[in-house]
Amino acid sequence: MGMRPTARMPKLTRRSRILILIALGVIALLLAGPRLIDAYVDWLWFGELGYRSVFSTVLVTRFVVFLIAGLLVGGIVFAGLAVAYRTRPVFVPSNDNDPVARYRALVLSRLRLVSIGVPVAIGLLAGIIAQSYWVRIQLFLHGGDFGIKDPQFGKDLGFYAFELPFYRLLLSYLFVAVFLAFVANLLAHYIFGGIRLSGRTGALSRSARIQLVTLVGLLVLLKAVAYWLDRYELLSHTRGGKPFTGAGYTDINAVLPAKLILMAIALICAAAVFSAITMRDLRIPAIGLVLLLLSSLIVGAGWPLIVEQISVKPNAAQKESEYISRSITATRQAYGLTSDVVTYRNYTGDAQATAQQVADDRATTSNIRLLDPTIVSPAFTQFQQGKNFYYFPDQLSIDRYLDRNGALRDYVVAARELNPDRLIDNQRDWINRHTVYTHGNGFIASPANTVRGIANDPNQNGGYPEFLVNVVGANGNVVSDGPAPLDQPRVYFGPVISNTSADYAIVGRNGADREYDYETSTETKNYTYTGLGGVPIGDWLSRSVFAAKFAERNFLFSNVIGSNSKILFNRDPARRVEAVAPWLTTDSSVYPAIVNKRLVWIIDGYTTLDNYPYSELTSLESATADSNEVAFNKLAPDKRVSYIRNSVKATVDAYDGTVTLYQQDEQDPVLKAWMQVFPGTVKPKSDISPELAEHLRYPEDLFKVQRMLLAKYHVNDPVTFFSTSDFWDVPLDPNPTASSYQPPYYIVAKNIAKNDNSSSYQLTSAMNRFKRDYLAAYISASSDPATYGRITVLTIPGQVNGPKLANNAITTDPAVSQDLGVIGRDNQNRIRWGNLLTLPVGQGGLLYVEPVYASPGASDAASSYPRLIRVAMMYNDKIGYGPTVRDALTGLFGPGAGAAATNIQPTEGGAPAASPPANAPAPAVTPGSAPPVAAPPVPDGSVTLSPAKAAVLQEIQAAIGAAKDAQKKGDFAGYGAALQRLDDAITKYNNTK
């Protein structure tokens, strides 16, 4: 029976077609409109920053890749369909029960839609996916050599970093395109009758056979190419159960030959498949494909498994030693841990020290950090917030400056930003929120080695930071009492002010000043932003675009927006850097610094790879997670890398948002490639001013990755490495409230890199022995301009207490626990332990220092800011304890040891009501003794007391006597009871008339 006439589809009316077109237009506008608006806004924003070339380069690259990939994949699929249609049988037998006939009629009635629409849809999807790989393509086009060859194939590492990923991408797209063309060709031949399944055997036309066989042969050829490329990827492969990365004995001696054998078999199979073009018998290509499948199972999987089990496992350490050595060398190269960077020195760790030796370590003892930046933020808020809408982050930053005597000191620093979430009531009105409350005001720095007065009780007026302030004062002038002069303390850009969904401020003169700035005793003073940053929104087009961008009609109707108005948005410093340098991974820590009288945010940027041969693959999220990151939710991105360089230092001006990128690593091939992709965007290292260099610090995230790798890759001997017996561990944070690794600490101490007593700003970490709590090493990374980036590892033999053991010894010492029990008053006051610092002192000793904070009440209320109340130390097995560093050092080493330590003076003015006096500091407390009792203040001159006050004064004297007696006897319970009597008596005295 002949083919039935083609069934006609019902025609749409003109009105229906118009309605459908309108509906499709609305849908397209809804889908594309927001993207077009975002693209236009980004174009404006990048232009305002001076990085429009970055935006245009990325956009053009994505578009070109989209076109090429779409045309390639769509074109191949179209060719498969077109050839199948053109070679279809002229006459196709059919009957009324043939289900294919209905599909054939449908396709023929919409032939243009199917033949063009399907390839276009597939091409669009392929292009959309491909454009996301623009980074890989740009690196292929601009990548260079590393100058290092891999140990197996002798290829420069630039091949693995820049070329191999592109070849893999191209191969994947060709494979997908040919496979889809095969599917399309198969379906087309089936629908048009080239393939018929009726009867027992069915029928296959000659044209269908030739086309399908050709496509299958191409797939097999592509598989042969894949086997060839697989050889190179073995060098970044990790076989399960091995303690190293890269091709091992089994991979080199079994898997690598297997890949070559499989490639040869694939070529033979491809020839067998192509033979079916001229031969009608399809059994030969079928046998070839089955052979390829069986070979991949036997040769590709079975043979390596046999070699692994029989040859390698019984002698694994010896068999793998050569390849372990390769991994050690490559990992050190990839993570910047080579011998020209890392220096190892032996250090006893438990040497005895005299008071004079400790006193001579002035660079260390004079800079012992008492302020924990994760604890003192409430004190900054309490004393320096000023207004409800100003805010300090929960975790402050550490930087260094020269003090007034020219000595290097570390400071806890913070910018006083505006927090939009703290605005209340009418302050949240759109006009107030975005045109009045636009900026923060001030830079606050506190010397980290001292506090303002001694507090013997959390209710006393002492123990809080000394504040050095750069701020706009009540007369409108800049008060510059900070560690460095600052011309402009207003903060329009920062991580706090940007932490909101509506991150924008509208600035610029439109009549009178509108922006809240400061207050005098009689009035509020406003300000108008004068910086260069900001996108103009004075015209109606810009106002309309931003109204759509932020879904806010006030852009159109508010009269506060004038011809001179500008909008500041995308104000997070790290996000700004990531936008203008999309190839960078930024450090999770951003810190403010005064550089050349300007307040800037400093951000560390990393270039990374994930396929460095033989280098260990590391998760940034897990490697950088420590107790601070977990507590403050600042985890690094979940990104796996096998190569990392701190290649860029970036600054963002806190006033006008200017982003500047500086080349930090002049040897990094990845950075060199990106500097060719985006010429002129990264300034050379020589442009880093000396003032900026003084505030660059070794980045935390990089250091945490490196210390985790040094735990393994400090081992030189491959057999020892395989046994893991000499590995180290990153210590857990000993604080009982912590749940992760101990963070590294920035400190100013004696110069470990130069091995002398000069002051050095460094990032440090202790390292434990593998699965034990004893110290194995001490790591210091220098941030000094002259020795920046040099890592010194002090290796410690013997059983020296690690952080956990030191913390346990300090917190369980009888004198310490008894004294803190009295201060805590049965949990009425909260005791918090600060960061446990590990400091090399003397001639081979290690000093542990742990500040103790207390706050009134058992909660974390903002008003209950913590005060430094004690300093605890441990040296070898001895505990030092007291209200000051000097007292604790004296208790440990004897008189004179703390001569260089900061001398904290007693708080002036006595104690507030219901508190023991603050003007009588307790001396150091040695283990096994309790602190002496502080006497109440004695009025100056002749004073006549009322009978009631005189009686209470006798109670005070009796309580003091009881406390002294208990102290002499070592009766801690009696001592605590006497102190409580004393506290009650003082309260009664102050309330008695």
UniProtKB/Swiss-Prot annotation:
What kind of membrane protein is this, topologically?
Multi-pass membrane protein
So where does this one cross the membrane?
18-38, 63-83, 113-133, 175-195, 210-230, 254-274, 287-307
Principal location listed in the UniProt entry: membrane
Pfam families from the entry?
UPF0182
| Composition bias, Pro residues | 929-939
The entry's cellular-component GO terms read: extracellular region; plasma membrane
Protein name per UniProt: UPF0182 protein MAV_4137
Instruction: Give the intrachain disulfide bonds.
Output: none
What is the annotated localization of this protein?
Answer: Cell membrane
Region Disordered: list its residue ranges: 903-941
* Entry-linked InterPro entries: UPF0182 (IPR005372)
Report the domain of life of the source organism.
Bacteria
Q: Does the keyword Phosphoprotein apply?
A: no
State the organism of origin: Mycobacterium avium (strain 104)
Q: Of which family is this protein a member? A: Belongs to the UPF0182 family.
UniProt keywords (A-Z) are: Cell membrane, Membrane, Transmembrane, Transmembrane helix
